[in-house]
Swiss-Prot record:
CDD domains: lytB_ispH (cd13944). Coiled coil: none annotated. It comes from Alkaliphilus oremlandii (strain OhILAs) (Clostridium oremlandii (strain OhILAs)). Pathway: Isoprenoid biosynthesis; dimethylallyl diphosphate biosynthesis; dimethylallyl diphosphate from (2E)-4-hydroxy-3-methylbutenyl diphosphate: step 1/1; Isoprenoid biosynthesis; isopentenyl diphosphate biosynthesis via DXP pathway; isopentenyl diphosphate from 1-deoxy-D-xylulose 5-phosphate: step 6/6. This is 4-hydroxy-3-methylbut-2-enyl diphosphate reductase. GO terms for biological process: dimethylallyl diphosphate biosynthetic process; isopentenyl diphosphate biosynthetic process, methylerythritol 4-phosphate pathway; terpenoid biosynthetic process. [4Fe-4S] cluster binds at residues 12, 96, 190. Catalyzes the conversion of 1-hydroxy-2-methyl-2-(E)-butenyl 4-diphosphate (HMBPP) into a mixture of isopentenyl diphosphate (IPP) and dimethylallyl diphosphate (DMAPP). Acts in the terminal step of the DOXP/MEP pathway for isoprenoid precursor biosynthesis. It holds the Pfam family LYTB. Isopentenyl diphosphate binds at residues 42, 74, 124, 218-220, 263.
């Protein structure tokens, strides 16, 4: 069986930075406990590995007040920093630089009098965090129905969750532009997301089956699944680990494409490839 790996897959810069930050804190923790405020990234295997090394996940600052609290790669609302400062909690910021850029944009343009529109999932921690940098006043749109609920406004500033699909951004932005005579657009989908999506789409056209490796709660992985299903609706499979590969299905085909989300470590991708090669 022929196994082809997408040109762009696996860890992105922001995820690598967050994990490196966490392990550097382990080296210099000075006997303090280390926590992450929410899962550092959306990959359960990596989170388990961090926990095995003593880095625990907490859901609020107070639970980590006796140690060092690492801000997750998805970022957090602005008031978290203020809260930590007032409580004298030691924070280490592992926010993805691309996410931090969006936070700065919405903070700046809200102060300039713009209404902020975030294209993304309102329940995703990245979007929740971004909204917290414009006083939680953003219009968050996930689909056309959400756009219809936006009134006509004087000034609009549009940003996007870093992991949405480019097609969704293009479609919804065109609609949002009809809601104001003065619209600023910032395509804040990160380059790693675009590269992975294009690479996955091209590979799906060339193979019989697509395997997408990544966390079930990972937004960017879910987008890869959606894109591949457009090309291979019946033979696209989303897995987290090599143990979930549908081997009984793969044996009926000649070629398999493998790609992975931005929070999927190389060792998991390698395990998947090895298992398919041994079919």
């Amino acid at each position: 069986m022929k196994v082809v790996v997408a040109d762009h897959s696996g860890f992105c810069f922001g995820v690598e930075k967050a994990i490196d930050t966490a392990f550097k804190e382990l080296e210099y923790k000075d006997s303090k406990d280390i926590y992450t405020l929410g899962p550092l990234i959306h990959n359960q295997q990596v989170i388990s590995h961090l926990e095995e090394n003593g880095i625990k996940v907490v859901s609020d600052l107070n639970s980590g007040k006796d140690g060092v609290v690492i801000i997750r790669s998805h970022g957090v609302p602005k008031d978290v920093y203020k809260d930590a400062s007032e409580k004298k909690i030691d924070l280490v910021d592992a926010t993805c630089p691309f996410v931090r850029k969006i936070q700065n944009i919405v903070e700046e343009y809200q102060k300039k009098g713009y209404h902020i529109v975030i294209i993304g999932d309102p329940s995703h921690p990245e979007v929740i965090g971004i909204n917290g940098w414009c006083d939680n006043t953003a219009h968050i749109v996930k689909n056309e129905d959400d756009v219809h609920r936006i009134p006509f406004l004087d000034n609009l500033c549009i940003v996007a969750q870093t992991t949405i699909s480019t097609s969704l951004y293009t479609e919804l932005t065109a609609m949002i532009e009809q809601k104001s005579n003065n619209v600023l657009k910032f395509n804040t989908i990160c380059s790693a997301t675009r590269d992975r999506q294009n690479s996955a789409r091209n590979l799906a056209k060339e193979v019989d089956v697509m395997i997408i490796v990544g966390g079930y709660h990972s937004s960017n992985t879910q987008k890869l699944v959606e894109i591949c299903k457009q090309e291979k609706p019946d033979t696209t499979f989303h897995i987290e680990t090599a143990g979930e590969i549908p081997m009984n299905i793969l044996k009926n085909y000649e070629s398999v494409g493998v790609t992975a989300g931005a929070s999927t470590p190389k060792w998991i991708i390698d395990e998947v490839i090895d298992r398919i090669n041994n079919l």
